[in-house]
């Protein structure tokens, strides 16, 4: 028989840097999950992606066990890295803060494809281009 799910927790944690401090500790603690066990497993799974923010979806079961699925980093983080930016534009339609090429967009779309609700690579590229425009990044 399948285990009974008592909660799903969604967090965004820097790769390889999960620790019991907020936001991880309180989110897991209220569901009775062993926080250190999660931190060790997450850090081991994401150590090769250092420097990126990794979204994670944790499923907590009635017996206080858990499993988690890591997603691809947010498109905005990947675009900032590709354009070499610290932060996006506060006024994207007025102030353009950087540029990315179509090749950069294609690489990001290929990386994000499993998490995007897109039927084709072209559709995924259009989604990423839209994100870039809303951040004040010019696509060339």
Curated annotation (Swiss-Prot):
Gene Ontology cellular-component annotations: cytosolic large ribosomal subunit
Mod. after translation: One or more lysine residues are methylated.
Record keywords: Methylation, Ribonucleoprotein, Ribosomal protein, RNA-binding, rRNA-binding
GO molecular function: large ribosomal subunit rRNA binding; structural constituent of ribosome
Keyword Transcription recorded: no
Gene Ontology BP terms: translation
Pfam families: Ribosomal_L11, Ribosomal_L11_N
Protein family: Belongs to the universal ribosomal protein uL11 family.
Subunit structure: Part of the ribosomal stalk of the 50S ribosomal subunit. Interacts with L10 and the large rRNA to form the base of the stalk. L10 forms an elongated spine to which L12 dimers bind in a sequential fashion forming a multimeric L10(L12)X complex.
HAMAP family from the UniProt entry: Ribosomal_uL11 (MF_00736)
Function: Forms part of the ribosomal stalk which helps the ribosome interact with GTP-bound translation factors.
Protein name: Large ribosomal subunit protein uL11
High-level lineage: Bacteria, Bacillati, Bacillota, Clostridia, Halanaerobiales
Gene from which the chain derives: rplK
């Amino acid at each position: 028989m399948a285990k009974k799910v008592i909660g799903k927790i969604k967090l965004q944690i820097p790769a390889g840097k999960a620790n019991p401090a907020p936001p991880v500790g309180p989110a897991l603690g209220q569901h009775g999950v062993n926080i250190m066990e999660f931190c060790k497993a997450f850090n081991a799974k994401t150590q090769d992606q250092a420097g990126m923010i990794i979204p994670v979806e944790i499923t907590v079961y009635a017996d206080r066990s858990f499993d988690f699925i890591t997603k691809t980093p947010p498109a905005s983080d990947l675009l900032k890295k590709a354009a070499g930016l610290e932060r996006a534009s506060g006024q994207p339609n007025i102030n353009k803060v950087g540029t990315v090429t179509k090749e950069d967009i294609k690489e990001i779309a290929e990386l994000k494809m499993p998490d995007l609700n897109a039927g084709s690579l072209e559709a995924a590229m259009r989604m990423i281009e839209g994100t870039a425009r809303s951040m004040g990044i010019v696509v060339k």
